[in-house]
């Protein structure tokens, strides 16, 4: 599903997830810690929390269906887990689009060592 998430991000932001979001700030990409540094990093934090809620179904790697309808991403029918993961990805991609005006290139490839302070809680 990471490829599908990348396609959603590309559709919403016109940017490829790699390199623009895969290592952005303290929460985009694998894992996350400390405080979310920018609006785009907050989208990634919420996405991580969303995946955490759906992880009980061990669904993080489930393939899902989605389509574009009238310029909007729409998740298709599938198992409960597939639908949940699709919604997590769809909401995050839309959040990244809304935060485009605050995107900071200085947070691309942000080193984990600079992620300080208390971690956010879901």
Curated annotation (Swiss-Prot):
Subcellular location: Secreted
Activity regulation (UniProt): Inhibited by Mn(2+), Mg(2+), Zn(2+) and Cu(2+).
Keyword Zinc-finger: no
A Gene Ontology cellular-component term: extracellular region
Catalysed conversion reaction: a 1,2-diacyl-sn-glycero-3-phosphocholine + H2O = a 1-acyl-sn-glycero-3-phosphocholine + a fatty acid + H(+)
Gene Ontology terms for molecular function: calcium ion binding; calcium-dependent phospholipase A2 activity; phospholipid binding; toxin activity
Tissue specificity remark: Expressed by the venom gland.
Temperature dependence: Optimum temperature is 35-45 degrees Celsius.
Residues holding Ca(2+): 27, 29, 31, 48
Co-factor binding comment: Binds 1 Ca(2+) ion.
Catalytic residues of the enzyme: 47, 89
Cofactor dependency: Ca(2+)
Activity across pH: Optimum pH is 8.0.
Paired cysteines (S-S): 26-115, 28-44, 43-95, 49-122, 50-88, 75-86
Annotated SUPFAM superfamilies: Phospholipase A2, PLA2
EC number: 3.1.1.4
CDD domains: PLA2c (cd00125)
Top-level lineage group: Eukaryota
UniProt keyword Secreted present: yes
GO biological process, one term: arachidonate secretion
InterPro entries membership: PLipase_A2 (IPR001211), PLipase_A2_Asp_AS (IPR033112), PLipase_A2_dom (IPR016090), PLipase_A2_dom_sf (IPR036444), PLipase_A2_His_AS (IPR033113)
Subunit structure: Monomer.
UniProt record similarity statement: Belongs to the phospholipase A2 family. Group II subfamily. D49 sub-subfamily.
Function: Snake venom phospholipase A2 (PLA2) that displays neurotoxic and myotoxic activities. Induces inflammatory edema by mechanisms involving mast cell activation and arachidonic acid metabolites. Increases plasma creatine kinase activity. PLA2 catalyzes the calcium-dependent hydrolysis of the 2-acyl groups in 3-sn-phosphoglycerides.
Record protein name field: Basic phospholipase A2 LmTX-I
Protein species of origin: Lachesis muta muta
Organism ancestry: Eukaryota, Metazoa, Chordata, Craniata, Vertebrata
């Amino acid at each position: 599903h990471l490829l599908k998430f990348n396609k959603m991000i590309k559709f919403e932001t016109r940017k490829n997830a790699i390199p623009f979001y895969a290592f952005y700030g303290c929460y985009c990409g694998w894992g996350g810690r400390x405080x979310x540094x920018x609006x785009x990093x907050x989208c990634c934090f919420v996405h991580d929390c969303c995946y955490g809620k759906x992880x009980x179904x061990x669904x993080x790697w489930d393939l899902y269906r989605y389509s574009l309808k009238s310029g909007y991403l729409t998740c298709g029918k599938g198992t409960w887990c597939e639908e949940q993961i699709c919604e997590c990805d769809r909401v995050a991609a839309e959040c990244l689009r809304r935060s485009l005006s605050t995107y900071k290139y200085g947070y691309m490839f942000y080193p984990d060592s600079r992620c300080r302070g208390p971690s956010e809680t879901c």
